[in-house]
């Protein structure tokens, strides 16, 4: 009887172990892809304006978002979000938390099979909203297509007030794109695969609960090189001319 049970449960155990390891590998690969996409997009000076990137509290990268196999026009993507550490978001870029993006067929109007998205989270309310639960862009957090190029100073009031600025790249074409109506949420299962334990997304992204995993080093190093300091928190010393 014991031998029979062994023959029944041993294959199931081996299969479950394989599935778990395979999922972990996929999540590691996705983190590495986030780093590749970030490097390709952020290292082009005329794409995302430097002043906006410097003001961003967090950055989210969704690589290769595709049309879902279900639903008319539905799309689904998975990626990673990293935030500047510290109470005022003025520290180093921290360990990423895995995220999921769900919505309509955004970005596919030009016939692309897959679209890369980069989202800038511009304030702490936007960051806390996204990390806390499932957020509908445009309703739970204000969102707008991000301005492109060196002339970002000409951005509209809508863009200036937005908590989330979004950009897309498909077939080599880069542009600001509105993701209003889509949802963003923490991917808790993927976080467990990456970090080996169940830990809230907010603890990872905002409170330094985890170290940067090797698969995320390219993403973090790209951001460190492109925007190492939070511009709005830099202090300057001025000469007050304190003569006698």
What are these regions (language model features)?
Residues 1-6:
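Positively charged n-region of N-terminal signal peptides that target proteins for export
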Residues 22-244:
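Small-residue-enriched, tightly packed secondary-structure blocks
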Residues 7-16:
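Bacterial N-terminal signal peptides
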Residues 16-22:
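Bacterial Sec-dependent signal peptides at the C-terminal "C-region" and cleavage site
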């Amino acid at each position: 009887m014991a031998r029979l049970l062994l023959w029944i449960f041993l294959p199931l155990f081996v299969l479950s172990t394989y599935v778990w390891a395979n999922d972990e590998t996929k999540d590691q690969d996705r983190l590495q892809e986030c780093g590749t996409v970030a490097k390709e997009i952020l290292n082009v000076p005329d794409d995302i304006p430097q002043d906006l990137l410097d003001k961003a509290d967090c950055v989210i990268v969704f690589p290769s978002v595709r049309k879902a196999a279900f639903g008319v026009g539905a799309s689904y993507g998975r990626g990673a979000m990293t935030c500047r550490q510290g109470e005022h978001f003025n520290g180093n870029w921290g360990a990423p938390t895995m995220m999921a993006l769900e919505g309509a067929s955004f970005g596919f109007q030009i016939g692309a099979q897959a679209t890369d998205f980069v989202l800038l989270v511009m304030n702490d309310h936007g960051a806390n909203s996204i990390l806390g639960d499932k957020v509908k862009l445009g309703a739970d957090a204000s969102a707008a297509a991000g301005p492109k190029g060196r002339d970002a100073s000409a951005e509209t009031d809508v863009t200036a007030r937005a908590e989330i600025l979004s950009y897309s790249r498909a077939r080599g074409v880069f542009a600001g794109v509105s993701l209003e109506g889509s949802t963003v949420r923490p991917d808790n299962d993927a976080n467990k695969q990456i970090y080996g334990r169940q830990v809230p997304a907010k603890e990872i992204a905002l409170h330094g609960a985890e170290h940067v995993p090797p698969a995320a080093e390219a993403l973090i190093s790209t951001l460190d090189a492109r925007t190492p300091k939070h511009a709005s928190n830099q202090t300057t010393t001025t000469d007050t001319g304190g003569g006698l």
